[in-house]
Protein backbone atom coordinates (compact mmCIF):
# COMPACT_ATOMS: atom_id res chain seq x y z
CA UNK A 1 0.00 0.00 0.00
CA UNK A 2 1.30 3.47 -0.88
CA UNK A 3 -1.43 5.43 0.91
CA UNK A 4 -4.03 4.59 3.52
CA UNK A 5 -6.93 6.57 4.94
CA UNK A 6 -8.32 5.37 8.27
CA UNK A 7 -11.79 5.79 9.70
CA UNK A 8 -13.92 4.18 6.99
CA UNK A 9 -16.09 1.06 7.22
CA UNK A 10 -16.93 -0.12 3.72
CA UNK A 11 -18.55 -3.44 4.62
CA UNK A 12 -22.06 -2.05 5.23
CA UNK A 13 -21.91 1.18 3.27
CA UNK A 14 -20.33 0.32 -0.04
CA UNK A 15 -17.46 1.90 -1.92
CA UNK A 16 -15.00 4.62 -0.98
CA UNK A 17 -14.01 6.89 -3.84
CA UNK A 18 -10.87 8.95 -4.44
CA UNK A 19 -11.82 12.39 -5.72
CA UNK A 20 -9.64 15.15 -7.22
CA UNK A 21 -7.09 16.61 -4.83
CA UNK A 22 -6.57 13.35 -2.97
CA UNK A 23 -9.91 13.57 -1.18
CA UNK A 24 -11.52 10.28 -0.16
CA UNK A 25 -15.24 9.90 0.48
CA UNK A 26 -16.91 6.85 2.00
CA UNK A 27 -19.03 5.37 4.76
CA UNK A 28 -18.06 4.99 8.40
CA UNK A 29 -19.41 3.28 11.50
CA UNK A 30 -21.86 0.39 11.72
CA UNK A 31 -25.34 -0.20 13.10
CA UNK A 32 -25.37 -3.89 13.94
CA UNK A 33 -27.10 -6.24 13.32
CA UNK A 34 -28.34 -4.21 10.35
CA UNK A 35 -26.18 -4.01 7.25
CA UNK A 36 -25.72 -0.25 7.35
CA UNK A 37 -23.28 2.54 8.18
CA UNK A 38 -23.74 5.50 10.51
CA UNK A 39 -22.16 8.36 8.57
CA UNK A 40 -20.70 9.48 5.26
CA UNK A 41 -17.27 11.15 5.44
CA UNK A 42 -14.91 13.10 3.20
CA UNK A 43 -11.24 13.24 4.27
CA UNK A 44 -8.41 15.20 2.68
CA UNK A 45 -5.13 13.61 1.61
CA UNK A 46 -3.73 13.92 5.13
CA UNK A 47 -6.81 12.29 6.66
CA UNK A 48 -8.37 15.48 8.03
CA UNK A 49 -12.18 15.64 7.93
CA UNK A 50 -13.63 17.98 5.31
CA UNK A 51 -17.30 17.02 5.44
CA UNK A 52 -19.57 14.56 7.20
CA UNK A 53 -23.25 13.68 7.27
CA UNK A 54 -25.17 11.59 9.80
CA UNK A 55 -28.42 13.51 10.49
CA UNK A 56 -30.89 11.22 8.76
CA UNK A 57 -32.57 9.15 11.49
CA UNK A 58 -31.98 8.55 15.18
CA UNK A 59 -31.17 5.02 16.34
CA UNK A 60 -30.69 3.39 19.73
CA UNK A 61 -27.27 2.01 20.58
CA UNK A 62 -26.63 -1.17 22.56
CA UNK A 63 -26.39 0.87 25.78
CA UNK A 64 -29.70 2.62 25.09
CA UNK A 65 -28.33 5.95 23.91
CA UNK A 66 -30.02 7.76 21.03
CA UNK A 67 -27.65 8.84 18.25
CA UNK A 68 -27.92 10.15 14.71
CA UNK A 69 -27.22 7.76 11.85
CA UNK A 70 -27.37 7.81 8.07
CA UNK A 71 -28.63 4.19 8.12
CA UNK A 72 -26.91 4.14 4.72
CA UNK A 73 -26.21 0.82 3.04
CA UNK A 74 -24.60 -0.55 -0.12
CA UNK A 75 -24.32 2.62 -2.18
CA UNK A 76 -24.04 6.39 -2.37
CA UNK A 77 -23.43 8.64 -5.38
CA UNK A 78 -22.38 12.21 -6.10
CA UNK A 79 -24.57 14.19 -8.51
CA UNK A 80 -21.45 15.11 -10.52
CA UNK A 81 -20.12 11.51 -10.48
CA UNK A 82 -23.18 9.50 -11.60
CA UNK A 83 -21.54 6.19 -12.52
CA UNK A 84 -19.15 6.29 -9.57
CA UNK A 85 -16.06 6.08 -11.77
CA UNK A 86 -14.12 8.45 -13.98
CA UNK A 87 -15.07 9.20 -17.58
CA UNK A 88 -14.20 12.01 -20.00
CA UNK A 89 -15.52 15.35 -18.74
CA UNK A 90 -16.29 14.07 -15.23
CA UNK A 91 -14.84 16.24 -12.45
CA UNK A 92 -16.45 15.29 -9.11
CA UNK A 93 -16.22 17.53 -6.06
CA UNK A 94 -16.47 16.36 -2.46
CA UNK A 95 -18.00 19.27 -0.58
CA UNK A 96 -20.37 20.88 -3.07
CA UNK A 97 -23.38 19.67 -4.99
CA UNK A 98 -25.76 16.89 -3.97
CA UNK A 99 -25.24 13.34 -2.75
CA UNK A 100 -27.63 10.39 -3.12
CA UNK A 101 -27.71 7.86 -0.27
CA UNK A 102 -29.42 4.47 -0.17
CA UNK A 103 -30.78 4.09 3.38
CA UNK A 104 -33.04 1.93 5.53
CA UNK A 105 -36.20 2.73 7.45
CA UNK A 106 -38.19 0.20 9.51
CA UNK A 107 -41.99 0.14 9.58
CA UNK A 108 -44.97 -2.14 9.01
CA UNK A 109 -46.90 -1.82 5.73
CA UNK A 110 -49.81 -4.32 5.92
CA UNK A 111 -50.38 -4.27 2.15
CA UNK A 112 -46.86 -5.67 1.72
CA UNK A 113 -46.45 -7.88 4.81
CA UNK A 114 -47.56 -8.07 8.41
CA UNK A 115 -43.89 -8.37 9.37
CA UNK A 116 -41.67 -5.38 10.13
CA UNK A 117 -40.08 -4.20 6.89
CA UNK A 118 -36.52 -3.04 6.50
CA UNK A 119 -37.57 -0.71 3.72
CA UNK A 120 -35.32 1.08 1.23
CA UNK A 121 -35.42 4.87 1.33
CA UNK A 122 -33.41 7.03 -1.03
CA UNK A 123 -32.43 10.45 0.24
CA UNK A 124 -30.68 13.22 -1.64
CA UNK A 125 -28.84 15.79 0.46
CA UNK A 126 -27.20 19.09 -0.42
CA UNK A 127 -23.76 20.23 0.75
CA UNK A 128 -25.30 21.52 4.00
CA UNK A 129 -26.76 18.10 4.82
CA UNK A 130 -30.35 19.11 4.11
CA UNK A 131 -32.60 16.43 2.60
CA UNK A 132 -33.85 17.88 -0.69
CA UNK A 133 -35.50 14.75 -2.19
CA UNK A 134 -36.51 11.32 -0.96
CA UNK A 135 -38.13 8.16 -2.30
CA UNK A 136 -39.59 5.27 -0.29
CA UNK A 137 -39.73 1.87 -1.99
CA UNK A 138 -42.86 0.59 -0.25
CA UNK A 139 -44.87 3.52 -1.62
CA UNK A 140 -44.25 2.23 -5.15
CA UNK A 141 -44.60 -1.56 -4.88
CA UNK A 142 -47.67 -1.51 -7.15
CA UNK A 143 -45.56 0.00 -9.95
CA UNK A 144 -42.95 -2.79 -9.89
CA UNK A 145 -44.98 -5.33 -11.92
CA UNK A 146 -45.02 -8.14 -9.37
CA UNK A 147 -47.73 -10.67 -10.19
CA UNK A 148 -50.12 -12.19 -7.64
CA UNK A 149 -47.78 -15.10 -6.85
CA UNK A 150 -44.88 -12.77 -6.27
CA UNK A 151 -46.92 -10.47 -4.05
CA UNK A 152 -48.10 -13.46 -2.01
CA UNK A 153 -44.51 -14.61 -1.58
CA UNK A 154 -43.42 -11.14 -0.49
CA UNK A 155 -46.34 -10.99 1.97
CA UNK A 156 -45.12 -14.20 3.62
CA UNK A 157 -41.79 -12.46 4.37
CA UNK A 158 -39.50 -15.39 3.47
CA UNK A 159 -36.41 -13.34 4.26
CA UNK A 160 -37.53 -12.21 7.72
CA UNK A 161 -34.47 -12.14 9.97
CA UNK A 162 -35.20 -12.62 13.69
CA UNK A 163 -31.85 -11.12 14.66
CA UNK A 164 -32.78 -7.88 12.92
CA UNK A 165 -36.48 -8.21 13.62
CA UNK A 166 -37.26 -7.17 10.05
CA UNK A 167 -37.72 -8.27 6.44
CA UNK A 168 -35.45 -6.66 3.83
CA UNK A 169 -38.08 -7.15 1.14
CA UNK A 170 -36.51 -5.25 -1.77
CA UNK A 171 -32.84 -5.31 -0.75
CA UNK A 172 -31.76 -2.53 -3.09
CA UNK A 173 -28.00 -2.77 -3.55
CA UNK A 174 -27.24 0.11 -5.90
CA UNK A 175 -28.72 3.50 -6.73
CA UNK A 176 -27.18 5.72 -9.41
CA UNK A 177 -28.06 8.98 -11.06
CA UNK A 178 -28.75 8.20 -14.73
CA UNK A 179 -26.28 10.88 -15.80
CA UNK A 180 -25.92 12.55 -19.21
CA UNK A 181 -26.83 10.17 -22.05
CA UNK A 182 -27.86 10.17 -25.70
CA UNK A 183 -31.32 8.69 -24.98
CA UNK A 184 -32.33 11.83 -23.12
CA UNK A 185 -30.64 14.03 -25.72
CA UNK A 186 -32.86 12.32 -28.33
CA UNK A 187 -36.02 13.07 -26.35
CA UNK A 188 -36.56 10.07 -24.06
CA UNK A 189 -37.35 11.77 -20.75
CA UNK A 190 -37.35 8.46 -18.86
CA UNK A 191 -33.58 8.75 -18.90
CA UNK A 192 -33.33 12.32 -17.62
CA UNK A 193 -29.84 12.71 -16.10
CA UNK A 194 -31.15 13.32 -12.58
CA UNK A 195 -33.45 10.29 -12.58
CA UNK A 196 -32.22 7.33 -10.54
CA UNK A 197 -31.48 3.70 -11.51
CA UNK A 198 -32.11 1.24 -8.68
CA UNK A 199 -31.11 -2.43 -8.48
CA UNK A 200 -33.16 -4.79 -6.30
CA UNK A 201 -31.07 -7.84 -5.50
CA UNK A 202 -33.86 -9.68 -3.69
CA UNK A 203 -36.39 -9.55 -6.53
CA UNK A 204 -34.07 -9.41 -9.58
CA UNK A 205 -35.44 -6.09 -10.79
CA UNK A 206 -33.69 -3.02 -12.18
CA UNK A 207 -35.78 0.12 -12.58
CA UNK A 208 -35.57 3.86 -13.18
CA UNK A 209 -37.31 6.32 -10.86
CA UNK A 210 -38.23 9.80 -12.11
CA UNK A 211 -38.01 12.83 -9.86
CA UNK A 212 -41.78 12.74 -9.29
CA UNK A 213 -41.24 9.31 -7.69
CA UNK A 214 -42.83 7.16 -10.36
CA UNK A 215 -41.14 4.11 -11.88
CA UNK A 216 -40.71 4.96 -15.58
CA UNK A 217 -38.59 2.05 -16.88
CA UNK A 218 -38.10 -1.51 -15.65
CA UNK A 219 -36.22 -4.73 -16.34
CA UNK A 220 -37.63 -7.86 -14.65
CA UNK A 221 -38.80 -9.56 -12.54
CA UNK A 222 -40.54 -11.64 -15.24
CA UNK A 223 -38.13 -11.90 -18.17
CA UNK A 224 -40.68 -13.73 -20.34
CA UNK A 225 -42.98 -10.73 -20.79
CA UNK A 226 -41.31 -9.11 -23.80
CA UNK A 227 -39.07 -10.34 -26.65
CA UNK A 228 -36.34 -7.99 -25.44
CA UNK A 229 -36.37 -9.46 -21.93
CA UNK A 230 -36.58 -12.99 -23.32
CA UNK A 231 -33.36 -12.28 -25.22
CA UNK A 232 -31.66 -11.31 -21.96
CA UNK A 233 -32.92 -14.49 -20.32
CA UNK A 234 -32.70 -13.67 -16.63
CA UNK A 235 -30.64 -11.64 -14.19
CA UNK A 236 -30.22 -12.90 -10.65
CA UNK A 237 -28.88 -11.09 -7.61
CA UNK A 238 -27.44 -8.30 -9.74
CA UNK A 239 -25.37 -5.28 -8.59
CA UNK A 240 -24.15 -1.90 -9.89
CA UNK A 241 -26.76 -1.21 -12.57
CA UNK A 242 -25.83 2.07 -14.25
CA UNK A 243 -25.65 3.90 -17.56
CA UNK A 244 -22.19 3.87 -19.17
CA UNK A 245 -21.07 7.52 -19.24
CA UNK A 246 -20.54 9.57 -22.36
CA UNK A 247 -17.06 9.29 -23.83
CA UNK A 248 -16.64 5.59 -23.02
CA UNK A 249 -17.26 2.53 -25.24
CA UNK A 250 -20.92 1.56 -25.02
CA UNK A 251 -21.98 5.00 -23.81
CA UNK A 252 -25.71 5.07 -23.11
CA UNK A 253 -26.01 1.32 -22.59
CA UNK A 254 -26.90 -0.05 -19.18
CA UNK A 255 -24.15 -2.08 -17.52
CA UNK A 256 -25.23 -4.65 -14.91
CA UNK A 257 -23.11 -7.09 -12.94
CA UNK A 258 -25.18 -10.31 -12.95
CA UNK A 259 -24.05 -12.11 -9.81
CA UNK A 260 -26.17 -15.23 -10.16
CA UNK A 261 -27.05 -17.25 -7.08
CA UNK A 262 -30.62 -17.19 -5.82
CA UNK A 263 -33.16 -14.39 -5.72
CA UNK A 264 -36.67 -13.58 -6.80
CA UNK A 265 -40.17 -14.21 -5.49
CA UNK A 266 -42.97 -16.49 -6.65
CA UNK A 267 -43.28 -20.16 -7.53
CA UNK A 268 -40.00 -22.11 -7.89
CA UNK A 269 -38.92 -22.68 -11.48
Model-derived segments and their meaning:
Residues 1-269:
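Histidine-/acidic-rich catalytic cores in large beta-rich domains
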Amino acid sequence: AVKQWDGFNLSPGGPARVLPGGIVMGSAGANLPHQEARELLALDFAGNPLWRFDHNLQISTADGASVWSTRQHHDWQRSDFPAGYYAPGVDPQAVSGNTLLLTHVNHVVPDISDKMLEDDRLIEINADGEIVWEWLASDHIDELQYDAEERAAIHSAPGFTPGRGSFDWLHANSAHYVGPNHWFDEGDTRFAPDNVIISSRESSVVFVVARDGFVVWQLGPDFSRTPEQQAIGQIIGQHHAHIIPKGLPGAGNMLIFDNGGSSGYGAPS
